[in-house]
């Protein structure tokens, strides 16, 4: 995948953490994963990409970070709804990032959708 495309998602992810939650994100080095590679994160926001490039973009978070994002969001929910709201919040967060990233890389035709 093109570095411009990867960097657009990385930059917009960092911007979204700051603007939505006041969290300054410090990313590790972006990398490509092989199909079936395991990971250590409990919650994932996934996007399918087609067009000039094909693949999946994954925003993976530890549950403790998703819980902090949920706390900072100001959403009201019952204890029984907590996990559902955390997953929903990460999904919406991923959608915000994808919308901004696609705008930032308008020179490429990319169609983005949940896998």
PLM regions with names:
Residues 1-115:
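N-terminal auxiliary interaction/assembly segments of multi-subunit proteins
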């Amino acid at each position: 995948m093109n570095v411009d495309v990867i960097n657009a998602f990385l930059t917009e992810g960092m911007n979204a953490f700051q603007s939505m939650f006041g969290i300054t994100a410090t990313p590790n080095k972006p990398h490509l994963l092989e199909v079936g590679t395991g990971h250590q994160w409990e919650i994932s926001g996934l996007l399918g990409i087609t067009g000039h490039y094909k693949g999946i973009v994954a925003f993976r978070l530890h549950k403790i970070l998703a819980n902090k994002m949920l706390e900072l969001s100001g959403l009201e929910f019952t204890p029984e709804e907590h996990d559902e709201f955390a997953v929903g919040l990460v999904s919406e967060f991923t959608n915000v990032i994808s919308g901004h990233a696609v705008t930032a890389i308008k020179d490429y035709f990319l169609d983005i959708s949940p896998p």
